[in-house]
UniProtKB/Swiss-Prot annotation:
The gene is bioA. Pathway: Cofactor biosynthesis; biotin biosynthesis; 7,8-diaminononanoate from 8-amino-7-oxononanoate (SAM route): step 1/1. Belongs to the class-III pyridoxal-phosphate-dependent aminotransferase family. BioA subfamily. It is found in: Cytoplasm. NCBIfam families: bioA, PRK05964.1. This is Adenosylmethionine-8-amino-7-oxononanoate aminotransferase. The lineage of its organism: Bacteria, Pseudomonadati, Campylobacterota, Epsilonproteobacteria, Campylobacterales. It comes from Helicobacter pylori (strain ATCC 700392 / 26695). It comes from the Bacteria.
């Protein structure tokens, strides 16, 4: 047993991995990673893997990015962490100012992961309505079908992906779901369904929560900005808060800095995480407006404070990485560069997959910014997603399909040559699976 195999065996003995059926790893070994550089992960046998999903959608500018790493090292020498109640630090003050300026919002509230950020938004919306109207009638949340907002109980309550939700349904909050349009032909029907729901329940609804334009864990479903804009206007007319979950879609992933910018509307609450620290350290931020903040601003005796906290809220090291990430966006014209890069990736996929599309093995090739996805229809002995995952690893590619949806969300530093190599390898794998 070599060093890599020994580590994998120890892993199985002591670790329980997320979103994994551990029994499968008895025959399909876990891969311990020794180091990473750029878009590549390296195991202890020096095998390289192209990280084509940005390590669960977090890594924007490559692993071991020289600039972000240096800023992190600089911060370690000054301050690693301090509680954020009654204390603060320069990295978080700078980051908060920059995020507010980027989003044209007023205040930042921090946590350390996306699900917690959603929980904060739900609590804050409910609490703000209560403080303003002194009524507890507004206690429901409205979300889109096929949506995903995290895996804590509150976040699961406003999600609609059965794989994650069904087991825990008896524990979840009662909420409302309105249909997301599957295509532009369904926009009017979806809006009419929303109108009927609002006519019946608007007095009970705290907030409408949505992932703008792209439902990532919902098989990378892209939906209309026109629908979202109209849905938001309908909710606003009924005094319903708007929560945009940009945990996965923020920081350039959909082609603009934030996806909601493409809808020309602003939320009451904006949830950010994943790419915020460039993929280095856990961090999330909820942004809101002074109109919300002022509901809580009062003498202590009035008991209006928002009492929510996490031990590592606003960690100084994570904030230093986030500031470094924003520096790169500012200095390197990332959004404009990504427009050209995303076009190249899509065209490469389109050309390479054309024969498989003609054979109806592949369909619905789509992209939004730096997100690319398509459906695969191949019969395999084991489930398709696992078969693709295994074969791509052997080709040196890291992909984790969602059911029959294969997607790419690569770091923004991927080169044209790396794109061509990755796509060629992927097509070879699909051909192998098709031929059995």
């Amino acid at each position: 047993m070599n060093f890599q195999e020994n580590l994998a065996a120890l892993d199985l003995e002591y670790l329980w991995h997320p979103c994994s059926q551990m029994q499968e790893h008895q025959n399909f070994p876990i891969i311990p990673i020794k180091k990473a550089q750029g878009i590549y992960l390296y195991d202890f046998n020096d095998n390289a893997y192209m990280d084509l999903i940005s390590s669960w959608w977090v890594n924007l500018f490559g692993h071991n990015n020289a600039y972000i790493s240096q800023q992190l090292k600089n911060q370690i020498d000054d301050l690693e962490h301090v509680l954020l109640a009654s204390f603060s630090h320069k990295p978080i003050i700078t980051l908060s100012q920059r995020l507010c300026q980027l989003t044209h919002m007023d205040k930042c509230f921090y946590a350390d992961n996306g699900s917690s950020c959603v929980e904060i938004a739900l609590k804050m919306s409910y609490h703000a309505h209560f403080l303003k109207n002194q009524t507890r009638r507004k206690k429901l949340f409205l979300s889109l079908s096929n949506s995903y907002h995290g895996e804590t109980l509150g976040a699961l309550s406003v999600g609609d992906v059965k794989l994650y939700k069904d087991t825990y349904t008896p524990l979840l909050l009662k909420n409302l779901t309105t249909p997301v349009p599957k295509n532009d032909h369904e926009i009017e029907n979806s809006l009419n369904a929303l109108k009927r729901l609002l006519d019946k329940h608007s007095e009970e609804i705290c907030a409408f929560i949505a992932e703008p334009l792209l439902q990532c864990a919902g098989n990378m479903h892209i939906y209309s900005a026109r629908y979202l804009k109209q849905a938001v206007l309908l909710c606003k007319q009924k005094n319903i808060h708007i929560i945009f979950d940009e945990i996965a879609t923020g920081f350039g992933r959909t082609g603009s800095m934030f996806a909601y910018e493409q809808c020309e509307i602003k939320p009451d609450f904006l949830c950010l995480s994943k790419g915020i620290s460039g993929g280095y350290l856990p961090l999330s931020a909820l942004l809101t407006h002074n109109e919300i903040y002022n509901q809580f601003y009062a003498p202590y005796e009035e008991n209006k404070a928002f009492l929510h906290s996490h031990s590592y809220t606003g960690n100084a090291l994570a904030c230093a990485c986030a500031n470094a990430t924003l520096d790169i966006f500012e200095k390197e014209n990332v959004i404009e560069k990504n427009k050209a890069l995303s076009g190249f990736i899509f065209n490469t996929l389109q050309n390479a997959l054309k024969p498989l599309m003609e054979q109806q093995v592949v369909s619905d090739l789509r992209h939004l910014g730096m997100v690319f996805a398509f459906e695969v229809f191949i019969q395999t002995k084991e489930r398709l997603s696992l078969a693709v995952f295994k074969k791509t690893l052997k080709k040196g590619l890291l992909l984790r399909p969602l059911n029959n949806t294969i997607y790419l969300m690569p770091p923004y530093i991927i080169t044209h040559e790396e794109v061509k190599k990755a796509v060629a390898g992927l097509v070879e794998i699909l051909d192998e699976l098709r031929k059995g």
